[in-house]
Amino acid sequence: YRNYELFCDLIQEFLNDNPDMGVSNIYDGLEHLTCAEIKLDDDDDNAQEIFERINSTGVPLSLSDKIRNFVLMTDTDQDRLYEDYWLKAEQILSKDQLEGFFLDYLNFKMDGFAKESTAYDEFKALYARGQYTNESMLEEIYHYVQQYHAFYYGDEKRFSSTVNHLLRSLQTLKQTTVYLFLFSVFDDFDAGVIDDETLCKVLRLLLNYSIRRLICEVGSNSLRGLYKTLYGRVFNRPENKNNYYDSIVSFLLQLTSKDVMPSDAEFVAALKERNLYRKKVQFTRDYTG
């Protein structure tokens, strides 16, 4: 019935704003309306779930489309929420980046790993578990979208030129799995837990670690799991934040798995022995200014 009232109001508003138009013009417009019929199996198909997943042309919705609909469609304040949060997020991330962001955001927030096929259900579970409102969820999404944009391009207004250079260097190396760790590190920077100098040291460490692994041909399969749990494992004791950078270094150096940081000797040997010219690897120089 709310939909019926909405259309009545819209039609009346249209007629008031366009006195030269009449009901016949609306009928003419309806003749161009295309309807899609989707037959459901009474036993297995849930109509609400199906309409959550398709757009007006019957094309499957993307993850970001489904999340947008979930947090906006049922909210009476949806126009303001859209303009204050969602539109701004769409303006700073491309469609593909927004899809990648939501997978990384979910992996950052969840205990396990999100897959594309289950990501929307995981998002709804996160929403319920965290007792979010639509606005609090959109506020958090926009906060991390801004971080994600900075990870890709830097942010001259928020961060120093050194931080921005180091972020772009990580992006040059295509080390995007590190974002699962950086979300928390940048939260600490925003909260004043660490300063610019410490943030730069952490980013240089991650860049050093990444380059050593690339040159020494250490497989990257385990990196996502490492970075997902790294913050919690390093700072499982709050006092470790008093020596923020040293705590991260100490943890990485104590690793005995395949995620161990390659030693200086291993790195030098790899530089001498590997045929680096045949590798499709992009290199970056650290910035110390």
Please give the residue ranges for each predicted region:
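Glycine-rich phosphate-binding loops of NTPases
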Residues: 1-21
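Mid-sequence acidic-hydrophobic segments that form the walls
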Residues: 14, 53, 57, 185, ...
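Nucleic acid-processing catalytic cores of prokaryotic defense/repair systems
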Residues: 1, 26-33, 38-48, 52, ...
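Short, functionally important structural connectors and interaction interfaces within domains
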Residues: 22-25, 53, 162-165
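A cross-family structural signal marking well-folded subdomains
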Residues: 34-39, 62-286
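Histidine-centered nuclease catalytic patch
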Residues: 289
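Solvent-exposed "coupling" segments
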Residues: 20, 24, 28-31, 146
